[in-house]
Amino acid sequence: MSVDNSTGSTASAVTGDTTAPGRIVIENCAIATVDAGDTEYDSGHVVVAGNRIEAVGAGPAPAGLERVVRRIDGTGHLVTPGLVNTHHHFYQWITRGLAQECNLFDWLVTLYPVWAGIDDEMCHAAAQGSAAALLRSGCTTSTDHAYVFPKDGGDILGAEIRALAELGMRFQPTRGSMDLGTSQGGLPPDACVEDTDAALAATAEAIDRWHDASFDAMVRVTAAPCSPFSVTPELLRGAAELARSKGVRLHTHGAETVEEEAFCRERFGMGPTDYLESLGWLGEDVWMAHCIHMDDSDIAKFAATGTGVAHCPSSNARIAAGIARVPDMLAAGVPVGLGVDGAASNESGELGTELRNALLIARLRGGPGALTARQALRLGTAGGAKVLGREHEIGSLEPGKLADLAMWRVDDVLHSGIADPVAALVLGAAAPLTLLLVNGREVVEQGHLSRVDEEEIARNVSRAAARLRAK
């Protein structure tokens, strides 16, 4: 890649002023727009003005553009929308490498007591470590499912929001919760759960404090009780009512394991999908993580209601939870995005890896035609944007959308000679990330974070992990 900054200062490349914006121009690159028509260009241009995409097309950029502050030669590169992560647990970044041979329930029972010791300082470090891995793998927008809030843990959600703002990432945090402890027949220890009313009040406070409904919002909040085996029906129902009264989305875990299926049938007399439906938890404003153990009826209900799915292939394999029926979901019209899940069940935390693993796992179950490279890329971009309710703002490269984009090198020693640049990205080795823009601002350059000190993040993560283990 060559860069011409002769017409302006890189530091002032994006002002966010959409009335008279400076422009970033990328030319001579392959482009996968992931728009509704899957438009691609073998050699094209992308023009960014302020925090919006101004133009995408074949050949060089239009002549006569004013206030071009950065011009990039994208020869040998593929430009795609920034990836969108639909499920994570940032606090787990400081508990990686534990419970390595467990199924979900045993893994949780092992780690709940450890997580009971987290605090806001630890979670700030963990969030930055998690976000660093995401950004360096091409992710521009992420959610996080925070559901452990120890009584003396401080402002955990605020610490996460501050951490991602410092890195420049678009964020959709959730205020999660648990109120069904072991004394009531739930899985988490009582020390990890909250009072139902207190959890709902804290969720309302988080929405009022942090949620931004504007088009280019960098923070939007979601209500997210944890799971059927850690949350009472009262909290699930109350959270749904609260979220809809405030116009925010809903998120939880659903149909992840056979143990969850057995728990729901024994305790509620129905499977997870029917149980959650009975509490108002199906709809276009809802997405659920995993959704592995679903029959045709469950998939049909998700499709009919527009309920979304966060598919987490690496995590599902790590704890041997099963293989989600993603091709069947897509065929039925279910919105599906990709998630890395928490780093305690997916130590790499890289969303780019999930493109490949989603394809491989789908084919393992359904054969070589089960999922294509372009379908995998769509899951990680437009699919994730739809699941998060932001399909009009992000997820594809189209004029008027927000300038969240990734520029991948596909002519290096590991990718040169691969005929199809999308296949190079999805099926090849992890492609070097030359540039990542979030809201029109550079957040990754030449594979490294451009707004923070990576070594400082590493030191803070190490200290936080050691402090937690010492508790």
Language-model segments: residues:
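His/Asp/Glu-enriched, well-ordered alpha-helical/loop segment
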Residues: S278-D285, P327-D412, L427-A430
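Metal-coordinating catalytic core of metallo-dependent amide/deamination hydrolases
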Residues: G153-C291
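Active-site microenvironment of metallo-dependent hydrolases
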Residues: M1-G44, V48-E54, G64-L65, T381-K471
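Alpha-helical scaffold segments that flank or form the walls of functional sites
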Residues: R96-H145, P150-R170, L200-F215, S462-A470
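Active-site gating loops and adjacent loop-to-helix segments of metal-dependent hydrolytic enzymes
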Residues: I94-A125, D152, L180-T196, A217, ...
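Glycine-enriched alpha-helix->loop->beta-strand junction motifs that scaffold or abut catalytic
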Residues: G168, A240-V248, W281-E284, K301-A310, ...
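Histidine/acidic-residue-rich catalytic or RNA/ligand-binding cores of hydrolases
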Residues: S183, V258-M270, D298-A303, A320-M329, ...
